[in-house]
Design a protein with these regions (language model features):
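Aromatic- and glycine-rich beta-strand/loop motifs that create alpha-glucan
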Residues: 1-14
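Junction motif at the cytosolic side of a transmembrane helix
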Residues: 194-211
Length: 211
């Protein structure tokens, strides 16, 4: 976290990717072929997913030259506490990217989010917890390999799917003006996966450090 506060490399790289992806999607969009309300949810979750992966990879990569993880392992700290600390730090980065991307998508695609902004924020935050829980575990496994940039998406994306699908469905319905009661099932699924991923990844993390 201190390294990131000094360099801001993780935040800047993730934000740069989000802005670039948003720009490409916007200029490739033909409003006569696809309605903005149909496109915006997909664009939003593509940006969240891949900017999050980039941020997760960078958050571990910047620590490699200083051997910060070795220092943590030598300290009298529970391995689970190390995981939770990394998770909270990564969650902060992901939420920051989401806080920039969500208004940008709403503005560019002319989506009115005022009426359902709080349920939408709840969906986004629940999904962020699930994605970061899994991503932090796999990023710690992949960072020390020579193909970390390739290995992290291969490991993490299959486990992202159970989180992204209900989140995208809930986002699409909320942006279409549906009632919050229509997305309560998706919210319950997100909450359930968050609990499962958080507990399982916390228990598995100490074993990944021993490899």
């Amino acid at each position: 976290m201190l390294i990131e506060l000094r360099s801001r490399s993780v935040i800047l790289s993730a934000l740069a990717f989000a802005v670039l992806a948003l720009t490409i999607f916007f200029f490739a969009w033909d409003p006569t072929a696809v309605a903005s309300i149909d496109l915006a949810p997909g664009v939003l979750w593509v940006i969240f997913t891949f900017s999050g992966l980039l941020g997760l990879h960078r958050s571990f990569g910047v620590e490699q030259p200083t051997r910060a993880m070795d220092a943590l392992l030598a300290a009298p700290i529970d391995r689970e506490a190390i995981y939770l600390g990394k998770l909270i730090a990564n969650l902060g980065f992901v939420i920051l990217v989401q806080a920039v991307s969500l208004p940008a998508v709403a503005l560019l695609y002319n989506v009115q989010v005022g009426a359902y902004v709080w349920p939408l924020i709840g969906v986004v935050l629940l999904a962020a917890i699930g994605l970061v829980s899994v991503g932090t575990l796999f990023a710690s496994m992949a960072v020390s390999t020579r193909l970390a940039e390739l290995l992290l998406p291969l490991l993490a994306l299959p486990f992202f799917v159970p989180v992204i699908l209900p989140a995208a469905q809930a986002t699409a319905r909320l942006m279409s003006g549906r009632a919050v009661s229509e997305v309560s099932g998706y919210i319950s699924i997100l909450a359930a996966f968050d609990v499962v991923f958080l507990v399982v990844c916390t228990l598995l993390y100490p074993y990944t450090l021993e490899q």
